């Protein structure tokens, strides 16, 4: 996605700890046209698989997942990182390490919104090591739903997340690929795949 690659090149900043700051694009401020294009691109990739749900993780995955679900015309469900008092009844849970949150996060999805009848596409903001996506895939598997594919806005190719997701046996689509980055200012971005 050329517009996204250009925007990351122009606005992306590398922070200590291997964190890519793109909060003016996808994590804090959202650009409507760019977000719409993300959804359209993911929908073209995954629409032929006939998903019934788009699933993501709060918070930064919500915008691209919602844009995708709007194009596909299917509901979007997001895993919560804290169980609210309104989440009554049984839930699927998983744990994952979050670099940006600085520790382990627990994920929650109500049984009410994910079932064995669902055909799921996961859309999220980043693919780094793949740990959080593997945790979410485990929740989907536990529900009996069929995981059809995963899409991530930005992939940090050097963290091997794609290889870690290979065991899932589903297509993985990314929109921008960070080939190399360092705190000295190096940021090499290519189109995703």
UniProtKB/Swiss-Prot annotation:
Reaction(s) this enzyme catalyzes, per UniProt: XMP + diphosphate = xanthine + 5-phospho-alpha-D-ribose 1-diphosphate
Residues holding xanthine: 20, 27, 156
CC per GO annotation: cytoplasm
Annotated compartments: Cytoplasm
CDD domains associated with the record: PRTases_typeI
List of residues binding 5-phospho-alpha-D-ribose 1-diphosphate: 128-132
Top EC group: transferase
InterPro entries: PRibTrfase_dom (IPR000836), PRTase-like (IPR029057), Pur/Pyrimidine_PRTase (IPR050118), Xanthine_PRibTrfase (IPR010079)
Classification via Gene3D superfamilies: 3.40.50.2020
HAMAP family listed in its UniProt record: XPRTase
Family, similarity comment: Belongs to the purine/pyrimidine phosphoribosyltransferase family. Xpt subfamily.
Identification of the protein by name: Xanthine phosphoribosyltransferase
Taxonomic source organism: Deinococcus deserti (strain DSM 17065 / CIP 109153 / LMG 22923 / VCD115)
